[in-house]
């Protein structure tokens, strides 16, 4: 039927097309005939007659070519005569219908869609494929593709069509093969060689380098925070540099101070680990070692700080002077340093005398030059002859000496004075040795015991065993009585015993000194005074102290000076002399000095004494030279291993003396005890004086380099920042991170605390004594507040010894008083909210509040009261305060009652008592302002004020799209929510109807009166009476409102107590909670914070959705299709589908994404159901109008006329109809003309 209807439709189209063509032919034929009636064209040689045109009919003749007859428009334009050729092609419709193929019939479906029509028109169909169900669009496209890839006919070459995707894959495979070849040839040998090279030592080295780079990166990262962005940061950096310099000056030279060593460790840890990432348990972001607190403390002194102007040299010198003042001056200097300073001073004096240009200055410079030469020659003489002198010649022998010999004699005399100084210092050292050797013995064994084997400080097992063997051989001795006394508190009796022991030790030392043979030089004659330079031999000097042979010496010197003409030679000779002496002298440039001849030969007059045997042999040995003697004098470093035998012998003598000596009573003991008993440093510590000198030298060099760099630059933010950064970096490299200082700190702490492991950085843990903080953190995972953090850290710092007890925060920072100026300048921030209740009597609510006007009225009474409060003294000397209450309580209206008088007197008395506090209306230093107190009392649990979030857009999504399945966040009716929109059949428990009374309770009227008396007027409307029906929200909100405001000042706790709350609790009715049907969903998500520096991790944004498919009542085909789509995500046994989404940044987005994915899967699976109708917009298509319209007879079903039986019209009949139509049109047109 369908094919027959299509063929009829096609035949009708053909018939209409033929009618349309015949009509056109008729019109063309008629136009050709009308044109033939016109006059013929003129022949050649004749003129064409001109048409006569009337001007009046010009406008009308323009359109005269067209004649409108109402129905037909006829064209009168002239056309060239053409013979119309009628196409008389014959079309046999029977033959056309018979020639229709199945392809034509099938293509009629796609006549409305040209793209599909074109696609299907390319293929050839068989009659057998008309009703083939397996034919799909995919198979047709595959056939079309194969057809396109066929070889062209007559082609000599094979056509290769390459798709881009295939070509890209080929290229990727080629690159992968090349990479594999490279790995086989080069990478594997390199990896094997790398694994052979890397061993344990290399790993340690790499680890150390990595740690250094990590420290540099962290320091660089922290340094960027100090870039200047304003004056405030500039001052902060200045404070930091000032504190760093001050800290360096006070602690580096402070000796074995344990607190300073701990402070340096803490500062190093703060620089290397500013965020305290090396802690164990304290994982909150507030633990920053109190850095912000230190910065705020430094701001107290920032107004007194003036930034240094590094472009000004005077400012740089002031900084150097500041460092010199901070450093403790060490007067106990090395003799070489003293000698070099003396020589430098004399050289400066010589230069100054030469610069004067006068004769006196020249004489003075010559005298100083001669003295300097004599002193240098005397030092050289002592070094050459091992600090021994021959016998001085007699005056008779001196008269025979030449001038050279006299000069040499003067050198020997000066050497004698220096030798006496050295001998005196040696005697002092010997006494010092006897007094301190016993203490050194005990300290040596104590340090030996302190450095016992320990796993903490041992590098490997062999080192541990060797140290253990040494400690076992050394042994340990029991604690003596003196050591036990040192550990006990020093009472007066203990101090006396200790004094007596000190006296006994001095006696033992004296006895041991007498027993030992003295190794000193025997003094046959009394030693002359060192201060008298001419006391050695007075025969050579006159009464005025002038040398007798000075004239000869001056003449000889004049001859030598004449030979010297160039000053440069003299300077070079002096420089060579100084280098020979190897004395570090700070010689300034352009300093003129004298010519010095190095002493390489012995004096001439000593040759005579050598013959007589009076001169000791010359030995150029360096054992007892002046330099080594000075080191033995000033740097006392005993070698305990070499002197162990001598020490043991002295210990035996001391023990024997203690055994033989009788113990004296306490009253007879004498002696003095130093209150500050300082323990000597351990032997492993470096020399503190040398270490301090090294640090100071490095600091001065770094400061000098920085000052020279910025000496002439403009002072702005950039230069100031660079200078501050460089100073701070130099401070860290020279002071904090110096290897010797780190080792010094560790040994200092070990000296004080024993053999302990010293941490590289400090970290803190929670203290279990703070039970409220531990409960709050462990149970509720809440971070510490700032006040709690200060409390915990100060407590821990005092326990570790890093803070003193008086520095601990004793008062809460929230309760700190505020300055009066701050309150007066900000009246809005500090409102006077307690003005009405601060002085009210809690028992009497009718008291008048104290205001400014009230105080001004009683101001004369206050002045009079102060006058009456004059302090007088009795005869006994006691102070008496005279207060006359009757004069103070003076009423203006004497006719008032006695009760009113008493009340007014009380008000006056309270005004007088608070006169010093309320004299200012705004400021009260004892008042706690509202922004300095917490809004809710913190008792260790979560207590957050209620806050309702406004919903900008109403949630109109379905339950599957709604992220808020439990309605947490939008308003709802509590009663309908709990009863699930069911009527409330349960009666109210404690609500009585009129006339009903519950036995055992008070009368309702009495109860209402009690409530009315206790409650305040402000809350009266919130408490319902018994005759009212309570609302569901009224009870809960009032209870929460009062519970949050309990014990708070602004909630008037004296007016509303717990009794009111309990009465409200009795009225509350709790309805049973019923089950609410929800979708069978289960979301699995994580809320753990993995790192404090990252806002959220990938685990937190991951959303897992588990769906119970059995709850959806799906058909078997849909379930199978869903299982086929989801593969292993679907569990066929439990019928649970698991979907995961983690592509989005937040958890709500991933939840929405996984729910959308489930909806898509459910829709796709439902398409397998043939009865499923999709209403989605992407799948819905509007129905197309039917192309076949049945006839009226077909609608009425009266008769059925098939087109094939009726037959098609013959060609003759059709031509006849056309001629009839043609004649009709022509006759109609002729009638109109």
Curated annotation (Swiss-Prot):
InterPro entries: Ribosomal_mS35_mit, Ribosomal_mS35_mt. GO terms for molecular function: structural constituent of ribosome. This is Uncharacterized protein DDB_G0279527. Residues 906-915 have a biased composition (Basic and acidic residues). Pfam families: MRP-S28 (PF10213). GO terms for biological process: mitochondrial translation. Disulfide bonds: none annotated. PANTHER family: MITOCHONDRIAL 28S RIBOSOMAL PROTEIN S28 (PTHR13490), SMALL RIBOSOMAL SUBUNIT PROTEIN MS35 (PTHR13490:SF0). GO terms for cellular component: mitochondrial small ribosomal subunit. Residues 513-529, 882-905 have a biased composition (Acidic residues). Residues 32-51, 510-529, 882-915 are annotated as: Disordered.
